[in-house]
Every structure is written in structure tokens, then in C-alpha cells.
């Protein structure tokens, strides 16, 4: 293809995808890149537009990894703000020098810092969320299910086929929930809970806000979510219930300004708008549904605190491991659990046989990959702007190779457990 044709087609293609290019830049335009869905942000954008007549505000939705990739493109030069609860995204942008320093009054309040990013001079915390369980009260009554109190309850066999959740690869908030469980219970016990909950899943939601939607629609009973999605639905539907789970961490909502060659007055104005008393005092009541940084009522020391440095560093590795252990082998995991439950019921009065079945069950829900393996790989493939394209390709290859190895080990363990169960049942049938 001749270069002049490509030069014409590329901007057109980007424009059609909703991605701004330098040629689109306008003095009275504000472009916000966010990992949140568009709808809850629209009332805030509309109010800002009323205050600043003639300003065109554009919202671009991407997941955290996609946002990093987008901002690394040289032709993407007029994104002004990033709005997200992903510490990985914000830390990556700050460390790569893409963020502008903010005035001190915009920085994270002291009482929220134990749950927030350390690089607060580049990031403003405009609110925070808690997380917990959302459930459909009518569904629970119909299926005679108990009300859950915390995430670990969802590991119980009674919830088999009634649970939904998103995956950390598709949801930054789910990633924080997964890391919270590992931090609270330790690597092995935490993964046992995650694997048992995974085996109880009816489906894995492709979107974090899809969890609350599924449950509100009566498709499933219960799932983990941040409070904002559940609270919005709970205002409209009295059968949608929510409880906070202190096993999860608190999740600040961040906004940061992309460093530009020009002074972007509207980016600063939007951050000031989000920090204003008018927005902060009504933040929980609007569609954004975050707790204000002026509101400490939810905060207590029982919420799990995360070691942000290691959490951010190993995000990609942990996301891959979750998908390999749960998402990609969900049918096999569910079938294995069902077979184990049926065998336990069959031999409930045979203690010696039951003990063997329970040992097989423990194998199914043991994570064969150690935390040290994950952390070591995370260090080896850590993003670095100084790396050449060849070195970056080597890191990607290393992650793929290690992922394949982990997949083989996980599959082998599950197959071995199934085989042992079949042999045991065959022996007892004789």
C-alpha cells in the first residue's frame, strides 16, 4: 500500500474507533480515558459542560492494559485525563513520565493513603469504593439458599451453579478483590477459596458491572462486586441486596492529567470540579456512586490492606494464572466438583472411603503454582520504558512460555484427581 494512502486511512480508522489523534485536537475539547463504563459518568460530564459552555467532552472506555497500550501510541496525543480505580494503570503512567504533577490540595487524604497508590503527587483521589456481595433476595428464596455474609461463603457447595463474578483480566476491581483474598488468607488458602468459588460459578461475567446486572435480572443468585454497581440497582430494585465484605480492600478512584506540551486549563478545571464541594457532597447519591474523600464513615482497620508495589508488579502474571486455573478450565472444574459432591453423598456413611474422596477434593483445590514463581516471573517481565522492542518481545515470549507450563501443570493435576476418583469409585463398586 502506498504510504500516502496509509497516512490517509489511519486517522480515518482511528476516528471511526473513537480514538483521538493529534489532528483532532481542539482548544475547547476535553478527552477523558476511563476504565469505568460511560453511563455513570455522563451526569458529571453534563454538569461540567453546563459550567463551561462550548466545551466538548469525549469519553473513551478501555480496560487498564488497553489504556496503557493506547497511551504508548505516538499518534495519540490529545487524551487529557485518565479516570480509573486501577492502581496498575496509574502507577504505570506515573513511572513512565506520562502524568503531570498536581497541586498538593488535590492529593490523597492521609486517612486513605494506606489503601492508595504511593505516587500521590501525580494522582488525585476523588473518591473510593468498598466491595462486597450483591444478591437477589427473590432468587435466594426460590432456591432456598442462605444469605451470604462474605466472599468465602461462596465456596460452599450449596451455591454450586448460582454464582457469577468477573475475572481480574477483564476487571481491575476484580483483580483487587482477588489480591485481597490472597492477602487475607495467604497464597494456598486464598487460592483454595478462589478455586472453590470458581467451581461454583454458573458463568464468568465479561464485565464487572455485568455481575450486578445478571443478579438483578434473576439469572444468578450472588456475586462479588464493588458497592457502586450494587447500590445503584438497589435504589430501583428492593430485592437486590448488598453487604460489605471486609476481606476486600478499599478501592480509591483516581484521576490524573496527562502531561502535555500545552497548558490544558480544562483538564485542571475538571479535576477541580470533581474535588469541589458540590460534587463531593453528592458523590454517593449520583450515578457515579462513590464515597466522597470527605466521608470516612466506611473506613476501618478491618478492611484488607494490600502491598501495592508487589500487587502492581505482578498484575499481568496473576491475571493469567486466574484465567488458566479457573476461566479456561471452568467446565472441567465444575464437572470435577459435581463428581466429588456426588461421591461424598454416596459414601457419607463410609468414613474410610469418604476420607479418600476428601483427599482427592483437596488436590482439586490446591494451587500447584507457588507465589514465589509468580513474583519471580513478574520481576523478569516487569515493564520498562528503557527496554528495546526486542527485549519487550522476549518478555512477552517468557510470559507465554511460563503460561503454557502453568497450564500443563494445572490440567495435569485436575486430570489426575479425576482419574483417582474414577478408580476409587470403580473399586468400591466391585
Could you describe each region identified by the protein language model?
Residues 134-139, 251-264, 282-283:
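A bilobed periplasmic-binding-protein/Venus flytrap-type ligand-binding module shared by bacterial periplasmic
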Residues 88-92, 216, 220-239:
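A ligand-binding cleft/hinge motif common to bilobed small-molecule-binding domains
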Residues 109, 129, 163-166, 193-198, 204, 273-295, ...:
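Periplasmic-binding protein-like
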Residues 42, 78-79, 85-205, 209-216:
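Extracytoplasmic ligand-binding site segments that recognize negatively charged/polar headgroups
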Residues 344-430:
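C-terminal non-catalytic accessory extensions
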Residues 25-91, 364:
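Early extracytoplasmic/lumenal segment of secretory-pathway proteins
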Residues 79-84, 204, 221-226, 241-242:
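Paired acidic/hydrophobic, glycine-rich loop segments that form the ligand-binding mouth/hinge
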